[in-house]
Amino acid sequence: MTSALEKNRPGAAFAFDNSYAGLPQRFFAPQAPTPVAEPWLIKLNEPLAEELGLDVEVLRRDGAAIFSGNLVPEGALPLAMAYAGHQFGGFSPVLGDGRAILLGEVVGRNGKRYDIQLKGAGQTPFSRRGDGRAALGPVLREYIISEAMFALGIPATRALAAVTTGEPVYREEVLPGAVFTRVAASHIRVGTFQFFAARGDAEGVRALADYVIDRHYPELKEAENPYAALFEAVSERQAALIARWLHIGFIHGVMNTDNMTVSGETIDFGPCAFMDIYNPSTVFSSIDHHGRYAYANQPAIGQWNLARLGETLLPLIDADQDSAVDKANAVIRAYGERFQAHWLKGMRAKIGLEGEEDGDLELVQALLALMQAQGADFTLTFRRLSDLAGDDAAEPGFATSFREPDSSGEWLARWRGRLSRDPQTAAGRAAAMRSVNPVFIPRNHRVEQAIEAAVESADFSLFEALLKVLAKPYEDQPSFAAYMEPPKPNERVLQTFCGT
């Protein structure tokens, strides 16, 4: 029981249990946040705070000071993490946290360890020429997308809080400053391994690998070859994650190796977006000039990133280099099969199939080709198909998803024939489909509207409304029906920006 006196201690909301700070100091740079002028708490994620075992009462009182960096909580060991990375294929040997500061780690009520990190908390030794700050728009975007991904069931970092700083930040224009508090299973990236490998720091790579196994994959400690098993486990999680991205039409936008976690969580939502009209070549990010990270390219980029991780682990996988390369290549080749298995399993679920038949892949591909040819909305097409799967399957919306409504007839006939051989009941199938086909996603135009109102008018009502809708993405919410609709032509977001 926390006494009233203890609650009144500044920053007593956290019970930090820091492990990364115990690694050799070349892994990070100690760095306190830089205080800001007038912090104001926009949003505190109280359910998440409770899951993390934090004192919500203290956070309500001191949250503006803590989450802005003005008050460093007791037990925190603030630091900026070192890492490298391939950015759009080009290697940068030193990147690191240029505007993010890890306050420390807490152990949640589920017994799992989590990082608490402030983004936009000031300059660090890795800032290069940056100011270490964040603008309000990108902070709100990351809050919205993080929590939407959680509600959709996609592994991702979480949003604990957002604050304004009362200070301007200078980009192409002057914008209000803000700080985002991110929660992650960890912030260890492929680029973290690359940082040490690029320096020939074999002991650094080994220490990091041991730490990752201990923190994220403790079951591998007894494996015959723990480091080869680690590479395989990371590959499995990444294949599953990217398959889930494709199932919901998510486009990360900047899949650099410094933006790929070894924990299997989605991280860094700067230019990310959700596809409206289905087109596998869709790109939103303003800096992805050649479509490297387009929707359909994401699985292959995941494999490319894993190859970069494998390169760093070769000396640990086997002392004989040729043998190490063979073992790593086997994992990289298997990634494609892993991804395809996860993707097809999820797509079967999206069209209501419980059993497996050889023709299922072609049936899925035929639907996607029809959607592309007919300019169909990705999210609503699958949701409306769910409405056709039940006993009361008279819902006409599916056909209207297509420019030529009659164009869907042939595919629907094939689909119904396939359903007739599937073991599920109609009611069970419809319920299962609705549990994997969302009705609400963070539509890009809705996200931009919420950001614009907050930045230009200090009006956070659209931000709050969007969070409320997206908290239940698989449920029909008649009072928020407008949020399910695709953008009108004049509302379409054609480009997204990193915002850093």
From Swiss-Prot:
Its EC number is 2.7.7.-, 2.7.7.108. Pfam families: SelO (PF02696). It catalyses: L-seryl-[protein] + ATP = 3-O-(5'-adenylyl)-L-seryl-[protein] + diphosphate; L-threonyl-[protein] + ATP = 3-O-(5'-adenylyl)-L-threonyl-[protein] + diphosphate; L-tyrosyl-[protein] + ATP = O-(5'-adenylyl)-L-tyrosyl-[protein] + diphosphate; L-histidyl-[protein] + UTP = N(tele)-(5'-uridylyl)-L-histidyl-[protein] + diphosphate. This is Protein nucleotidyltransferase YdiU. Its cofactor is Mg(2+); Mn(2+). The active site is at residue 258. Mg(2+) binds at residues 259, 268. Nucleotidyltransferase involved in the post-translational modification of proteins. It can catalyze the addition of adenosine monophosphate (AMP) or uridine monophosphate (UMP) to a protein, resulting in modifications known as AMPylation and UMPylation. NCBIfam families: PRK00029.1. ATP binds at residues 96, 98-99, 119, 131-132, 182, 189, 268. Belongs to the SELO family.
